[in-house]
Curated annotation (Swiss-Prot):
Name listed for the protein in its UniProt record: Cytochrome P450 monooxygenase 98
Major subcellular site: membrane
InterPro entries in the cross-refs: Cyt_P450, Cyt_P450_CS, Cyt_P450_E_grp-I, Cyt_P450_sf, Cytochrome_P450_fung
Species this protein is from: Postia placenta (strain ATCC 44394 / Madison 698-R)
CC annotations in GO: membrane
Gene: CYP098
Keyword Heme: yes
Length: 520
């Protein structure tokens, strides 16, 4: 009898196993029969390689979305499957609700392998290294402890105010300097002039990262076999470029980290991401390995934070030059709230809703990361009758989301009032652009609260002290900025350099600015 039962059980297992295999085969075949999402016509072998937009790709993707009547479009670049999501609803469904399979990162040959950014937090696949660095971020930059960094943000912003007063402003140089000393202090605890030796290298390294991080920027990303070409081969100039950019990355990662450790050892340090993380290391685990993780988290913090705030504040200045009435309205509210001789502080946020609305519109109108950083689909999936192949690069079109007429009526004009109620208070029913400005799903930027508050305090402080005016030529005529934006492949959307003037609003404002020299 027991033998008979065993035979029945074995037969039952065989039947169940066979049934499961059949179901799997049927499901796989049904997936294979499902169509890919719509998109431009694909050519043999190269797919849409010739259709890929070289710059401002988010505009083309939004155009294709309208042309094909679909929130999701599909492209193929020499065999690489690319999915572009063009609505908040679809991004929420896939990147949020199905984040388990949509949270990894596509590995770009140029950026990750040749330039060495593969283990950087923002670019790493979902693996133990990424999880460990995420834990470092969450502990060291916890939003509940945001006030710990307010002093650093105010110090850097006050230095920016003083530097803008020194003479004809090279705005972009000053903004890069402001962002650098701010992020160096928050990340490494390196302050003021001590940060100067690291700034130039960091700016160059971040520029190279922004270029190489844009899908389609280098042919080697579509045809990885090209990475084996000797550097001297015609057409292999990208390898020399990658080698030079890799050196910049290493300098950017190593030098300030070593300096931060020296400060901590000597006891002459202020709280920072690095100091907080080093204090939290597990003494029973490999210390060298933990330090490498902290170093990787730190360089990512510097990279993501610096470019984000520079792009946003330069976009704010350009918007003010194009809309002087917005500047006047913001300054009227500042004058109502601030006492004589006062500069804005973080305690004034609730009292300055127009400044907050202005920052929201800066983030919405020309988002800093219009396509975020591409995700990777780690398993086959389906959506609305379409097959979404495993291994696809998945891009969320933040620009399209932030220009959705159903969410932001009449989205093209720059208009901070869209975020305000008739009584001048913030309209909480209008979706906050920050929800689409700092990544999606499990890849949401852990330092977004610091970036947002840094942008806010700089905007409020500049408007409290200065009138932003157009540059004048030798004949005294105003020079109207072109308002052009960088048109090449890039992760970060930023305006091209333009000239302007920062004129103190009054003698009292000028006195405040001059007094800041002794405090920075």
């Amino acid at each position: 009898m027991p033998t008979t039962l065993r035979m029945l059980n074995n037969n039952l297992l065989i039947v169940i196993g066979t049934f499961a295999v059949c179901v799997y085969i049927v499901l796989q075949r049904s997936k294979a029969r499902l169509p890919l999402p719509p998109g431009p016509r694909k050519w043999p072998l190269i797919g849409n390689l010739l259709d890929m937009p070289g710059g401002r790709a988010w505009l083309k993707y939004a155009e294709w979305s309208r042309e094909y009547g679909s929130d999701i479009i599909h492209l193929s670049a020499a065999g690489t499957s690319i999915l572009v999501l063009n609505s908040a609803e679809l991004v929420n469904e896939l990147m949020e609700k199905r984040s388990a399979i949509y949270s990894s990162r596509a590995q770009l040959t140029m950026l990750h392998e040749l330039m060495g950014w593969k283990d950087a937090f923002s670019f790493a696949p979902t693996n133990p290294t990424w999880r460990a660095q995420r834990k470092i971020f969450m502990q060291a930059l916890n939003p509940n402890n945001a006030a710990l960094f307010h002093g650093k943000q105010l110090r850097a912003t006050h230095e920016l105010l003083w530097r803008l007063h020194k003479g004809p402003a090279n705005l972009f140089h000053e903004l890069h300097h402001w962002a650098a000393i701010l992020i160096m202090d928050i990340t490494y605890g390196i302050r003021g002039d001590a940060a100067d030796p690291y700034i130039e290298t960091a700016v160059e390294a971040l520029d190279s990262m922004a270029i190489a991080g844009a899908p389609g920027a280098f042919l080697v990303d579509a045809v990885p076999l090209l990475r084996h070409m000797p550097e001297w081969t015609p057409g292999a100039g990208f390898k020399r470029q990658a080698r030079e950019w890799n050196v910049l990355r290493q300098k950017m990662a190593n030098r300030p980290f070593i300096a931060a450790k020296q400060q901590i050892t000597s006891g002459s340090y202020t709280p920072s991401l690095v100091s907080n993380a080093l204090e939290a290391v597990d003494k029973n685990q490999d210390l060298a390995e933990q330090e490498e993780l902290i170093k990787g988290a730190a360089v990512t913090s510097y990279g993501g934070g610096s470019d984000t705030v520079v792009a946003a504040v330069s976009a704010f200045v350009l918007a003010i030059l194009q809309h002087p009435e917005i500047q006047a309205k913001a300054q009227r509210q500042l004058d109502e709230v601030l006492g004589h001789g006062e500069l804005p502080s973080f305690q004034d946020v609730q009292s300055l809703p127009y400044i907050t609305a202005l920052v929201k519109e800066v983030l919405r109108h020309n988002p800093v990361t219009p396509l975020a950083i591409p995700h990777l689909l780690s398993e086959d999936d389906t959506w609305d009758g379409y097959w979404l192949p495993k291994g696809s690069i998945v891009m969320a079109n933040a620009w399209a989301i932030l220009h959705d007429e159903n969410t932001y009526p009449d989205p093209m004009p720059f208009n901070p009032d869209r975020f305000l109620r008739p009584d001048g208070k913030l309209d909480e029913t209008v979706k906050d652009p920050a929800t689409a400005s700092f990544g999606f799903g499990r890849r949401l930027c852990p330092g977004r609260h610091i970036a947002l508050s840094s942008i806010w305090i700089s905007v409020a402080s500049i408007l409290a002290c200065y009138v932003i005016r157009k540059e004048v030529d030798a004949a005294g005529r105003e020079v109207v900025p072109d308002g052009e934006w960088y048109g090449g492949p890039t992760l970060f959307n930023r305006p091209l350099p333009f000239k302007c003037r920062f004129t103190p609003r009054s003698k009292a404002a000028e006195a405040i600015i001059v007094s800041l020299e002794n405090t920075v």
